Amino acid sequence: MSKVVRSSKYRHVFAAQPKKEECYQNLKVTKSAWDSNYVAANTRYFGVIWDAAGGGSFAVIPHEASGKTTSVPLFNGHKSAVLDIAFHPFNENLVGSVSEDCNICIWGIPEGGLTDSISTPLQTLSGHKRKVGTISFNPVADNVAVTSSGDFLVKTWDVEQGKNLTTVEGHSDMITSCEWNHNGSQIVTTCKDKKARVFDPRTNSIVNEVVCHQGVKNSRAIFAKDKVITVGFSKTSERELHIYDPRAFTTPLSAQVVDSASGLLMPFYDADNSILYLAGKGDGNIRYYELVDESPYIHFLSEFKSATPQRGLCFLPKRCLNTSECEIARGLKVTPFTVEPISFRVPRKSDIFQDDIYPDTYAGEPSLTAEQWVSGTNAEPKTVSLAGGFVKKASAVEFKPVVQVQEGPKNEKELREEYEKLKIRVAYLESEIVKKDAKIKELTN
């Protein structure tokens, strides 16, 4: 009996290895062991965390500047290593960074890109007591970002006003990922305690939580429409993929073993085409799956294979895809010295706009102000048609940062409390120095 082949318009999606001249070469990508993607992108630029001594730096490079680089200007205002970066979704000339120095910085990108290094951010946000590991901007509310830190806290910020909006508690260990849902009303986190948690950040309430993976290595979670995707490791160190309904956050709707490689899986979800991309750190493969609403909820499509292992990955906004070539996704793959564009395409010959694979997509325009969002208002993301092709925004959106004055202790009690906090911070930093000294001795012996 012949096997019935499942029908899907994405069954033959393919990706090809880019040409050398299309890659960004001679880059000094960070050697940090932190489980970040190391790269982020908007329609004009991509940013990559830099390997720099004596502080934290990252580069922002225009997409058209492919080929060999000689001298790259940097954003270099952090006092310790940069751990994560994210572009503002509504302002192409703003980028945020977080660091081991406990600060969140918002930087302005000059029109046309950097020509000289910049050391002074437009805005510095302080409030975390340990290193800040992740940053992500709200997809609908203007100037709202979320960060997570080694102090086990998740904080939301108004980056223009320089204010901490809300603080989410409830984690008992290091937070390994923190992502918004599609309309910015909830966040999902994963933690070293092996749990995935869905929060309402405006009320500091846990919507649901579950032990998602039994392995000791890091896990990650993202929203995929009304589902939650988690990736992590089993007790026997196999890489796993789970799909959950966050309203019944107990048993996964689907649980798959991906392989037995050792690197963390990085998940990316394309809401327009319902495609999930999985890229493994330390290997050169990018698997992609189609998600559906009924069991088994996920179908493997294909795999991009490369001999060059990736250290990080990100995807560009759908607005800058080449629709005339049926390009449905474009990723940027990070290696130790290059960033390589990977284009995913549907093999079709027609030059007519293919509206079945290009529904209206995320417009990159705010639906809410920060004030509306924090008051409890929800809204759907604005969308735009790709039928007319990609049109760059005429100019940057105005950004007027308000610098908050940091008030010192007002009396003896507050002074003593601040003193005790600083003692704890000094003890933590001293322990980190001891660990790094031991690591240096181990590597030199």
Swiss-Prot record:
It is found in: Cell surface. It comes from the Eukaryota. GO terms for molecular function: actin filament binding. Keywords: Actin-binding, Coiled coil, Repeat, WD repeat. The keyword Cell membrane does not apply. The keyword Repeat applies. GO terms for biological process: actin cytoskeleton organization; actin filament depolymerization; actin filament organization; aggregation involved in sorocarp development; cell motility; defense response to bacterium; endocytosis; gene expression. PROSITE patterns: WD_REPEATS_1, WD_REPEATS_2, WD_REPEATS_REGION. GO terms for cellular component: actin cytoskeleton; anterior cell cortex; cell cortex; cell pole; cell projection; cell surface; cell tip; cleavage furrow. Required for normal motility. Participates in cytokinesis. Binds to F-actin. Belongs to the WD repeat coronin family. This is Coronin-A.
